[in-house]
Amino acid sequence: MRPISTPAPRYPPEALRAGTSGEVLVELTVGTDGSITASRVLRAHPPRVFDREALNAVKRWRFEPVAAPVTTRRTLSFNPGG
C-alpha cells in the first residue's frame, strides 16, 4: 500500500496559540480505489485537542489502488514549531 497524497492536518488555532503539541493514532481503511473509506481515533494526547483535524486530514489521503480493502494505523504528530 503506497501513499499518493497525504496532506498534513491543519493545526487548531487555539492549540497553536497555546503552543500545544501532541499525537493522534488513527485507524484507517483504504478502499480498493485508494480512497479512505473509514477512519477513527484510537488514541490522542492530549485528548480531544487534535482529533478532528487529524480525521479531516486522513479523509483527504489517497493511496494507490489495492486488490482488497486494507485497514492500517498511522500516527499524526502536531508540533507548533513545525
Residue ranges of predicted features:
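A short acidic/small-residue loop/turn micro-motif
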Residues: P13-E14, R43-V49
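Short proline/glycine- and basic residue-enriched helix-capping loop/turn segments at helix->loop/beta transitions
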Residues: M1-E27, R52-G82
